[in-house]
Curated annotation (Swiss-Prot):
Keywords: Disulfide bond, Glycoprotein, Knottin, Secreted, Signal. The gene is ASIP. The keyword Glycoprotein applies. Involved in the regulation of melanogenesis. The binding of ASP to MC1R precludes alpha-MSH initiated signaling and thus blocks production of cAMP, leading to a down-regulation of eumelanogenesis (brown/black pigment) and thus increasing synthesis of pheomelanin (yellow/red pigment). This is Agouti-signaling protein.
Amino acid sequence: MDVTRLLLATLLVFLCFFTAYSHPPPEEKLRDDRSLRSNSSVNLLDFPSVSIVALNKKSKQTSRKEAEKKRSSKKEASMKKVARPRTPLSAPCVATRDSCKPPAPACCDPCASCQCRFFRSACSCRVLSLNC
């Protein structure tokens, strides 16, 4: 009986010390900015100051105009690029990424080969090696 009480007492003391040392100490309250600057680990003067500026109506309108100019120039550039019509291939072959399900002819590109998926239900000519 005395041994169990001794073990329980030491366990209680251990738990008291453990709970006391596991909690962090209360932080000191800083009274002014000077003590804050001296105690801080990061120097606040190292970072550049940030200024927030509100846009007025004129600057908003100019930015809209610039955006419209960019959009119109992109549209003009896309209109200038006219898609060239593909010339029909004279040889009996299958173009790259077209269906080549057997008994279709071979692929036109010498680096391409007919690759089938889903139990040979979907076949297409694909270029497998880039170094060809």
